[in-house]
């Protein structure tokens, strides 16, 4: 059914954007501060 092709791509685009936004929020709230804290603690320990 060729008339459904644009809706398929629109659906894929919508879920792709939702996935990107979710990943961005997850990384900015949870993973990146954890990595930064690990890096700062290693830096602090090596300065001792």
Curated annotation (Swiss-Prot):
Keyword Ligase: no
GO biological process: proton motive force-driven ATP synthesis
Keywords per UniProt: ATP synthesis, CF(0), Hydrogen ion transport, Ion transport, Membrane, Mitochondrion, Transmembrane, Transmembrane helix, Transport
UniProt membrane topology term: Single-pass membrane protein
Superkingdom of origin organism: Eukaryota
Stored InterPro entries: ATP_synth_su8_fun (IPR009230)
Protein name: ATP synthase protein 8
Gene Ontology CC entries for this record: mitochondrial inner membrane; mitochondrion; proton-transporting ATP synthase complex
Transmembrane regions listed in the UniProt entry: 13-32
Complexes and interactors: F-type ATPases have 2 components, CF(1) - the catalytic core - and CF(0) - the membrane proton channel. In yeast, the dimeric form of ATP synthase consists of 17 polypeptides: alpha, beta, gamma, delta, epsilon, 4 (B), 5 (OSCP), 6 (A), 8, 9 (C), d, E (Tim11), f, g, h, i/j and k.
Annotated GO MF terms: proton transmembrane transporter activity
Family: Belongs to the ATPase protein 8 family.
UniProt signal peptide: none
Function: Mitochondrial membrane ATP synthase (F(1)F(0) ATP synthase or Complex V) produces ATP from ADP in the presence of a proton gradient across the membrane which is generated by electron transport complexes of the respiratory chain. F-type ATPases consist of two structural domains, F(1) - containing the extramembraneous catalytic core and F(0) - containing the membrane proton channel, linked together by a central stalk and a peripheral stalk. During catalysis, ATP synthesis in the catalytic domain of F(1) is coupled via a rotary mechanism of the central stalk subunits to proton translocation.
Organism listed in the record: Saccharomyces cerevisiae (strain ATCC 204508 / S288c) (Baker's yeast)
Lipid metabolism as UniProt keyword: no
Compartmental location: Mitochondrion membrane
């Amino acid at each position: 059914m060729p008339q459904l092709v644009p809706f398929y791509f629109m659906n894929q685009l919508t879920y792709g954007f939702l996935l990107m936004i979710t990943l961005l929020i997850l990384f900015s709230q949870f993973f990146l501060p954890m990595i930064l804290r690990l890096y700062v603690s290693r830096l602090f320990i090596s300065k001792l």
